[in-house]
Amino acid sequence: MSVLTVHTSSKVYNVTVKSGVLSQIGSYIAPLRPSAILIVTDDQVADLYLDTVKSSLHNLAPLHAVVLPNGEETKSFDNYYALQTAALEYGLDRKSMIIALGGGVIGDLAGFVAATYMRGIAYVQVPTTLLAHDSSVGGKVAINHPLGKNMIGAFHQPEAVLYDPQVFATLPEREWRSGFAEVVKHGLIKDAAFYAWLQKYINDFSRIQGEIAEELLLRSIQVKANIVAADEKEKGERALLNLGHTLGHAIEAELGYGKITHGEAVVIGIIFAMKLSEKVYHQSLPIQDLEKWLKFLGYETRIPKGLDTGALIGTMKKDKKVERGVIRFVLLEEVGHAVIKEVDEQLIRELLNVEIEEETT
């Protein structure tokens, strides 16, 4: 078992990484003494883990569960409203707790419900995907709007994050790719040694188990925890965590949510941001080396066919980092050192045109 403590201005809490913790959740929740518990999960996770979690919480407090469809489309206003209604109908009060049992979609949605129900109640993140190692830490919770991803949300830190690496045994290949993108991102922005470690040890997702899984999770989460501790509300440094997300979110929105996983889109965004970095800083980055490794792991690294430069730029202008209509990118000066920088729209347009043209020829 490993425990990492996250320090923020609003809350201090632990991230516990422990095999078998799903069947022991009750022992972590009991000291918090919730008046009632609402588990929010999706249909795929429910089939695998809901009964285990329920058994662990048995007799702790009145227990309820809502099972939603799996997929990015679930992170909608309709489901947010339905969960608020369920919480009211179940009689949750301000001492009640929500448990987010699932991946990033469930964590974001359930966390936003917790942030706003009766002006805020406690919640615990129980991630069941690799992607959620990133989204479960830091307190950013949100739902999507048809005009943009994560546009309606809040900052609301969990009481705890309980992570059972045994869940990796049930992850499909695409979920591995979605989650590993955020791991790579953490190395690129702040920890060159971790990035080198990943390239050395992860040549197949089946390697992510046992001690390697635990080290990967802890080192990746530590990067995020350090940034969140310094900038909880994303006034500055925390925006570095958006490497690859400016274009990545635009690709997700333009293709339609669910057509490409978040991590698959972020990888394309990372490669684009690194190419943009080379043009801005006039120095080379190990892009070919990164692309070769990512392709070996099954990623597509080019902008999907059918997307239009103008539409992508229009969507990027809705990005939360935009200031006074100017697109701001997270760029790399070198591996392990990221910066936030305003980028001339014409330069973005020219590089997008080149990338899209190369993909169609």
Swiss-Prot record:
Subcellular location: Cytoplasm
Main location as per UniProt: cytoplasm
Enzyme class: lyase
Gene Ontology CC annotation, any one: cytoplasm
One GO molecular-function entry: 3-dehydroquinate synthase activity
UniProt GO BP: amino acid biosynthetic process; aromatic amino acid family biosynthetic process; chorismate biosynthetic process
Pfam families hit by this protein: DHQ_synthase, DHQS_C
Cofactor note: Binds 1 divalent metal cation per subunit. Can use either Co(2+) or Zn(2+).
Record InterPro entries: Dehydroquinate_synthase, DHQ_synth_AroB, DHQ_synth_fam, DHQS/DOIS_N, DHQS_C
Keywords: Amino-acid biosynthesis, Aromatic amino acid biosynthesis, Cobalt, Cytoplasm, Lyase, Metal-binding, NAD, Nucleotide-binding, Zinc
SUPFAM superfamilies associated with the record: Dehydroquinate synthase-like (SSF56796)
Binding of Zn(2+), residues: 182, 245, 262
Binding site for NAD(+): 104-108, 128-129, 140, 149
Pathway named in the protein's UniProt entry: Metabolic intermediate biosynthesis; chorismate biosynthesis; chorismate from D-erythrose 4-phosphate and phosphoenolpyruvate: step 2/7
Alphabetical list of CDD domains matching this protein: DHQS
Names of the cofactor(s): NAD(+); Co(2+); Zn(2+)
Catalytic activity: 7-phospho-2-dehydro-3-deoxy-D-arabino-heptonate = 3-dehydroquinate + phosphate
EC number(s) from the headed UniProt entry: 4.2.3.4
Function: Catalyzes the conversion of 3-deoxy-D-arabino-heptulosonate 7-phosphate (DAHP) to dehydroquinate (DHQ).
NCBIfam families, per the entry: aroB
Family designation: Belongs to the sugar phosphate cyclases superfamily. Dehydroquinate synthase family.
Protein name in the entry: 3-dehydroquinate synthase
Organism of derivation: Halalkalibacterium halodurans (strain ATCC BAA-125 / DSM 18197 / FERM 7344 / JCM 9153 / C-125) (Bacillus halodurans)
Lineage of source species: Bacteria, Bacillati, Bacillota, Bacilli, Bacillales
